[in-house]
Structure formats: C-alpha cells, structure tokens
Curated annotation (Swiss-Prot):
Belongs to the LcrH/SycD chaperone family. It comes from Escherichia coli (strain K12). This is Uncharacterized protein YgeG. Keywords: Chaperone. It comes from the Bacteria. Gene3D superfamilies: Tetratricopeptide repeat domain.
Amino acid sequence: MSTETIEIFNNSDEWANQLKHALSKGENLALLHGLTPDILDRIYAYAFDYHEKGNITDAEIYYKFLCIYAFENHEYLKDFASVCQPKKKYQQAYDLYKLSYNYFPYDDYSVIYRMGQCQIGAKNIDNAMQCFYHIINNCEDDSVKSKAQAYIELLNDNSEDNG
C-alpha cells in the first residue's frame, strides 16, 4: 500500500469523525461541503426554472441534489415531491410531501392535499380520504377545504358506483 493511499485513509477517518460530529449537532451536508446558502439559492433557481418550463426531469435532478445537501429545507422537499408526482412516483412524492409538512413551521394544508392526491394515484383511497378529512377537520383555508371536500365527494360517489 502506497503512502498516498494510507494518507487518504487517514484523512477519510478524520473526515468521517468530523462528519459524525457535525451531523450529531444537526448541521447539514451543504455547510460541511462548503455550499453556502447563496450557492444553494442559485441551484434552487435553476431547479425552479426547469420546473416552471415543464422540464421536470432536469428539475428533479437539481431538487434531489438540494435535498441531499439541505434535507431540512421544506421548500426543497416540497418541490422535489412536486416533480415526482407527475412522473407517477406517488409513494416517493407522498413521503417527500410528508417530510416537507413535518419540517414546515406552520400547518401547510396544501401539502396534505397533495399527499391525498398521491394516495389516489397509488390507489390507496382510504389513505387519501384520511388526508382530505384531516384538511376538512383542521384547515382554516376555505380554498383548500373546498378542494378537499370535492375529492371526498368524488371518491364517495365512485365507491357507491363500484360498491
């Protein structure tokens, strides 16, 4: 084994210890790799631009990168979910929306609404209904409530037609 290889292993152990220490304190990977908030904002701008232009495949690449390096950012999670959903990656989108909701400091019931849509796409109608009823029972935003109510009525009508 060359001295260069040994040096890499020594540095790797040191880096691993630094990583463990930083992560145990709740620091994100972006800071550990020198990705400043400004750099992350610029990457997010690219992702958002691709997303707005309908290029969800490229947007997904950037959102995934952002989530890896700044996982606690609810906007990154929500936007990553929003590109997974039209690609019919319903479970992944649902999980990302759920994480986004948990990281957001306020109740964003539009995220739960999207979670319900994902459950419909995944054919988990009971879970979708739970999402929509949660909105009806807890949300104060009439716009989101009316959309949830429309899904409840539609799903109830479909279950009566099929039952």
